[in-house]
Amino acid sequence: MILGFLSDSHGCFEALEKGLEALRRHGAEQIFHLGDSVGYFPGWSAADALRRESIPCLKGNHEAMLLLDEQDPAKDPMTQLGTTARQASPVQLKWVSQLPQSLRIEQDNVRILLVHGSPREPLREYIYPDTSLEPFFDVDADVVVMGHTHRADLREVGGKTFINTGSCALPRHPGGLGSAAVLDTGTGHGELIRFPIGNETRKAAARLSLHEAIVNRIAQYPES
C-alpha cells in the first residue's frame, strides 16, 4: 500500500491542495497530515479541508498553542493564532481538540509511528536534517514520520527509516519547494516529493493579512 504524508499546511488551503494533488499523483491510497494545520495564514481553510476529506491528522505545536491560549502577543502578528482562535466555531475547536499527538499504524507488517515533532517530544522537538537520530534507534517502529522543521529529510539508519515531510506550505529548505512524502509499505521504499507552491502561497497572501516576514519568504518561492 502506498501511504502519503504531509505536514505544516499552516492555514494555506491553496498549498495544501497542491500537496494533496502531488501525493495522489504518486499513488497515495491513504494520506496523513502531521500537524500545524493552523498558524501564519490566519483562518481555518486548510483545517476545514482536512476535516471534510476525513484525512487523519495529528496535533502540532500550533494547534496546542491555540487551544491552550498560549499565543505570545509579541509573536501573534506572525503566527496569527489569536486571529484564528477568534474565528473558530465550536465544531472547529472540537475537531482540533480531539487531534492526537501521535499515531501508530501497521500496514504489510511495517510498523509506522507518526509524530509532529519527535518520538520523545511529539509536539515541540525539532529533528533537523543534521540532528543525530541515534536516540531514536530503539523506538518501537520500523518507520518514523515527522514534520515541524519545515525541512524535508529522509534517512535510513539504525535499521529504521526516518522521514521528515517538510512543509507543504512554508518550506525553509533551499529552493523553496513544498514537500511531502510517500511510503510503499510493500517494498519499504520511502520517497520525498517536492512541488512548486509560489503561485498558491502568493494567491493566499493576496486574500489574507500576513506578517511581513511571511510575505517576504513566499515572495522567494519559484513560480508554479
Question: Residue ranges of each PLM-predicted region?
Answer:
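Active-site-proximal beta-strand elements of phosphoester/diester hydrolases
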Residues: 2-10, 111-118, 162-166
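Core catalytic region of metal-dependent phosphoesterases/phosphodiesterases
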Residues: 2-97
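Active-site environment of divalent metal-dependent phosphoester hydrolases
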Residues: 10-15, 39-42, 62-67, 120-122, ...
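Structural motif
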Residues: 30, 56, 112-113, 142-144, ...
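Active-site-proximal segments of metal-dependent phosphoesterases and phosphodiesterases across multiple
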Residues: 74-79, 107-139, 171
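Short acidic-hydrophobic surface loop/beta-edge motif
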Residues: 101-109, 155-157
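Anionic-ligand binding region
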Residues: 126-155, 160-163, 178
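Acidic, His/Gly-rich catalytic cores of divalent-metal-dependent hydrolytic chemistry
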Residues: 156-224
